[in-house]
Amino acid sequence: MAHSHSHTSSHLPEDNNARRLLYAFGVTAGFMLVEVVGGFLSGSLALLADAGHMLTDTAALLFALLAVQFSRRPPTIRHTFGWLRLTTLAAFVNAIALVVITILIVWEAIERFRTPRPVEGGMMMAIAVAGLLANILSFWLLHHGSEEKNLNVRAAALHVLGDLLGSVGAIIAALIIIWTGWTPADPILSILVSLLVLRSAWRLLKDSVNELLEGAPVSLDIAELKRRMCREIPEVRNVHHVHVWMVGEKPVMTLHVQVIPPHDHDALLDQIQHYLMDHYQIEHTTIQMEYQPCHRPDCHLNEGVSGHSHHHH
């Protein structure tokens, strides 16, 4: 049997990605503060709800920026994977904060149905339009230019695109108030925008908890991966003890592979590593090659479960 380890590295244009993220973060964070101040001055709850939605974008951009920065830090003896998991922890805290903010906004909206308050429609309209333009600018900053963007930049662009709906909601509420003076439009739209925030927060919470619990990437079908390896690599007879987890946005894998004793061990190992890289974008793999079938009870234990503890035979 043999135990081998591979860690290939890819070089993305990190400075370009960091610059995009920094500019978009500045625009989004700045207009989020404008919406918070404008929401209090105009009395508009829809603007405050949209500011909450913009907070999800600001946080997504910040985490993406931190991921780019922390990915440059080399691992240490104490932190052998570096500091990438820190962004996941921050995302988890942010998701909980967003849920709390959303509950407070919905509670305030219900109170406003009972006791309506005046809303300054003109100011609300001006700030909502400015917020919409800020979102468009942020999306353009993230999306234009080089096509080689990392996953964080793409995810941040989708966050900003989703926030356009929140700004449109605030504009609709402002138009209704200006034309009809019907102020309940404001809490109604604020609840609708809050549902968008809650959806983003729930997705963020689910993804961050999955990563903190060292769950496998949602997009990866481990059973299918094992079948394909046995089918497409002639020397591979069986794949077991497969464990996959995420560190930042990078998947890490350990696995045991039963193989036909090869004429060239290193060539077969290299073939398996390249197969996982090319088909599943897994750069960091630890492969234990075995020449005898594994008949122990734990050979197929926890096959659907991700983690990085595994037994050596």
Swiss-Prot record:
Membrane topology: Multi-pass membrane protein
InterPro entries the record matches: Cation_efflux (IPR002524), Cation_efflux_CTD_sf (IPR036837), Cation_efflux_TMD_sf (IPR027469), CDF/SLC30A (IPR050681), Zn_transptr_ZitB (IPR023500)
Membrane spanning stretches: 21-41, 48-68, 90-110, 122-142, 160-180, 182-202
Topology, Periplasmic side: 42-47, 111-121, 181
Stretches of the chain found on the membrane's Cytoplasmic side: 1-20, 69-89, 143-159, 203-313
Major location category of this protein: membrane
Keyword Electron transport found: no
Key word Secreted present: no
GO terms, molecular function: zinc ion transmembrane transporter activity
Keyword tags: Cell inner membrane, Cell membrane, Ion transport, Membrane, Transmembrane, Transmembrane helix, Transport, Zinc, Zinc transport
Localization of this protein: Cell inner membrane
Annotated function: Involved in zinc efflux across the cytoplasmic membrane, thus reducing zinc accumulation in the cytoplasm and rendering bacteria more resistant to zinc. It may contribute to zinc homeostasis at low concentrations of zinc.
Annotated PANTHER family: CATION EFFLUX PROTEIN/ ZINC TRANSPORTER (PTHR11562), RE54080P-RELATED (PTHR11562:SF17)
Protein name: Zinc transporter ZitB
Organism name: Shigella flexneri
